Each structure stands twice: as C-alpha cells, then as structure tokens.
Regions:
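Short, Lys/Arg-rich, polar N-terminal cytosolic tail immediately upstream
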Residues: 1-5
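Juxtamembrane helix-capping/reentrant segments at transmembrane boundaries
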Residues: 8, 67-83
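The first (N-terminal) embedded transmembrane alpha-helix
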Residues: 9-29
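Transmembrane alpha-helical segments of multi-pass membrane transport proteins and ion-pumping complexes
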Residues: 14, 18-19, 49-58, 89, ...
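Helix-coil boundary and interhelical linker segments in multi-pass alpha-helical membrane proteins
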Residues: 23-41, 92-106, 143-155, 194-200
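Alpha-helical transmembrane segments
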Residues: 37-52
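C-terminal halves and exits of single transmembrane alpha-helices
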Residues: 81-100, 122-124, 128
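Membrane-embedded catalytic cores of phosphoryl/pyrophosphoryl-handling enzymes
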Residues: 105, 109-200
Length: 200
C-alpha cells in the first residue's frame, strides 16, 4: 500500500497540477485564441511550473540545501517556496499582460497568494501540504469559472475534491503531514482564488 500511495503522491504532485488545470481550461472554456497561441501558453506554463521547479529541486539537492525532493522540513521549504511565489506571480503578470487571458492569470496570482500564506505560516512553525494546496486551488478555480461563464463544471469540481481526499489519505499514510497540515493546505488553496477574484 505504501508504494501505491507514493505513486499517487508523484502523479498528483503540486508541480503537475497547474499544467493539468490549464489543459482542462482550454478543453472546457470556448475561446477565439488560435491553437498556436494556446500551445505557446501551455508550453510557458509547463516550463515555469514544472521544469523550473524541478530544476530548482535538483540543484538544491546537489548543493545539499534539501535532503530529499520533498523538502520535508520547514527550513528546507523556505527558499523553494519563496522562489515559487515570485515565479507564479511573474507568470500571472506575463499571461495577463501579453495574452489577456485573465482567467489563467487569476489561477497563477491565486497560486502565488496561497504560497505566500504558506510562507507566512513558516514563521509560526506551521507547515502546509502543497499537494492539497494545489488541489484546493484547482477546485476553487473551476467553481469561479462556473460563475464567470454561467456553466457547471461540477464534474471537474467533484473529481478535484475526490482526488484531494485520496491524496490527503496518501500523505497521512506516508506520515508526510499531520491532519492539520493537510486541512490547512486545502483551505489556503481553496480561498486564494476566491480572494484574488474578489479583489481583482
């Protein structure tokens, strides 16, 4: 069972969810953007949210700044999370200002905001589950899209919630997090898009 839960944690890793979210967005939301524009944007998202974070973790492990790719301790998480806050904010700015795809910009502003809340928690020696944070963001994002486009994305929302439950169970079984860290991660992720949408 431990091996299964490890596989689940890898497949639904936080750096994978943003790319999946953007792919779902392009599938579900009608737009007049050319396929080449969508592909360019998807490539930018993949590089910024997957390849760069992966490279950062590899470099940090080589430099012995982290012991494992999970960056388990609060101290190990500080610098990677700080870099992710900046990366996601710059990505949101780039997408909003160059393509006008404000919905996707919202997704990454929200991610930056949720990571900022996570970073603030470090000062209180609180760690949050980034796996659950990413799924909380995805859940809330598609709820907001439902309001914006007067459509129901209930299937996506329900699947997100079910996956969050599976991942939460996996992280708890692997003793990667405590229940409070799992709940806090999903909570920060869920409220971030709502907050960004309300204020922007």
């Amino acid at each position: 069972m431990k091996k299964v839960y490890k596989i689940i944690s890898v497949i639904l890793h936080p750096i994978v969810i943003p790319t999946i979210g953007v792919i779902l967005y392009f599938i579900l939301i009608p737009s007049n953007y050319a396929s080449s524009t969508k592909l360019t944007l998807l490539s930018l998202v993949f590089v910024t949210t997957y390849l760069i974070p992966l490279l950062i973790l590899v470099v940090f492990k080589r430099l012995k700044l982290i012991q494992t790719f999970n960056a388990d301790s609060i101290q190990e998480r500080k610098l990677p999370v700080a870099m992710m806050i900046v990366l996601f904010y710059l990505l949101a700015n780039t997408i909003t200002n160059t393509t006008g795809m404000n919905d996707i910009g919202l997704l990454f502003y929200a991610t930056s905001a949720a990571l900022t809340a996570t970073y603030v928690c470090f000062a209180f020696q609180l760690k949050t589950s980034l796996h659950l944070l990413s799924l909380g963001i995805s859940t809330s994002f598609f709820i907001i899209l439902g309001f914006i486009y007067a459509s129901s994305f209930s299937t996506v929302v329900v699947v997100n919630i079910l996956l969050a439950g599976v991942v939460a169970n996996a992280r708890l079984y692997l003793k990667a997090h405590t229940p409070s860290e799992v709940y806090l991660g999903f909570f920060f992720g869920f409220i971030a898009p709502l907050g960004v949408y309300y204020f922007l």
